[in-house]
C-alpha cells in the first residue's frame, strides 16, 4: 500500500508539473478524495526531482551541446553560454524569496498557505492570470534574442510558485507570453528554468526535514522518484 501511494504521488506530480496547473493543489485534492496522507512540502519537493531528471533527459542536446566547443574548456562554456546565464539570473528571485520564507515564516507557508481555502483562492487567481496571458498578443521574443531582464522577470513570477496553488510552469509561461515571448520558446525556457528551482527546493527540504525522509525510507522515495520521471517524460 505504501508503494502504491508513492506511485500515485509520482504520477500526479509528473503529469501536472509541465501543465499549467498546480501539482501541489492536485496532490492535495486527490489525497483528500482518496483519504490518504497529504505528501506535504518535503515529500513533494523530493519527488519533483524526477521532473528535473526528465527535463535534463528531454533537453539533453540543449544542455550538453558542446559541439563546436572543442577549443574551449567546459568551465568557460558554462560561464559564457547565454542560456545558462539566463537560467542563473532567473533563479535568483526564487532563491531570495523561498529562502526568506523558509527561514523566517516556515509555519505560515506549511500550515496557512497549504490550507484548502488558500489553495482554492490562489488557483482562481492563477486561472485569471493565465487567461490574460492566453488573450495577449503573440510576441516574437525567443531564447536567442531575449534580454536578461526578461529572465529576471520570469524568474520573479516563478518565485511565486512557492505558494501552493500557483503552477510553476503556468505562471512562468504566462508571464513570458505577456512579456512578448513566442509560445514555444516560452514553454521551453520555463522547463529549463525549473531545473535549478526544483533541485534547490528539494535540497532545502532535505536539510530542514532530514528526520522525515529517514522515517519514510529510501525505497518508497525511489519508487516515487522513478514514477515522477516516467510520467514527466509523457507530459513534456
Predicted region positions:
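Multi-pass membrane proteins that catalyze or facilitate reactions on polyprenyl-/lipid-phosphate substrates
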Residues: 1-236
Amino acid at each position: 500500500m505504501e508503494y502504491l501511494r508513492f506511485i500515485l504521488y509520482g504520477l500526479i506530480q509528473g503529469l501536472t508539473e509541465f501543465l499549467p496547473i498546480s501539482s501541489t493543489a492536485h496532490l492535495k485534492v486527490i489525497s483528500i478524495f482518496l483519504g490518504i496522507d497529504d505528501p506535504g512540502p518535503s515529500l513533494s519537493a523530493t519527488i519533483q526531482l524526477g521532473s528535473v531528471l526528465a527535463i535534463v533527459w528531454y533537453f539533453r542536446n540543449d544542455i550538453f551541446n558542446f559541439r563546436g566547443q572543442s577549443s574551449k574548456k567546459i568551465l568557460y562554456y558554462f560561464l559564457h553560454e547565454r542560456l545558462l546565464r539566463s537560467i542563473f539570473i532567473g533563479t535568483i528571485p526564487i532563491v531570495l524569496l523561498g529562502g526568506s520564507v523558509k527561514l523566517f515564516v516556515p509555519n505560515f507557508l506549511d500550515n496557512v498557505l497549504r490550507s484548502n481555502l488558500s489553495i482554492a483562492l490562489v488557483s482562481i487567481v492563477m486561472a485569471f492570470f493565465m487567461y490574460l496571458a492566453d488573450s495577449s498578443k503573440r510576441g516574437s521574443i525567443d531564447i536567442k534574442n531575449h534580454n536578461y531582464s526578461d529572465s529576471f522577470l520570469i524568474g520573479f513570477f516563478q518565485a511565486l510558485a512557492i505558494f501552493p496553488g500557483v503552477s510553476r510552469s503556468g505562471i512562468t509561461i504566462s508571464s513570458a507570453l505577456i512579456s512578448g515571448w513566442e509560445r514555444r520558446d516560452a514553454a521551453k525556457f520555463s522547463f529549463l528554468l525549473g531545473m535549478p528551482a526544483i533541485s534547490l527546493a528539494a535540497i532545502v527540504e532535505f536539510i530542514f526535514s532530514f528526520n522525515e525522509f529517514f522515517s519514510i525510507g529510501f525505497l518508497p522515495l525511489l519508487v516515487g522518484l522513478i514514477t515522477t520521471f516516467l510520467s514527466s517524460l509523457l507530459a513534456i
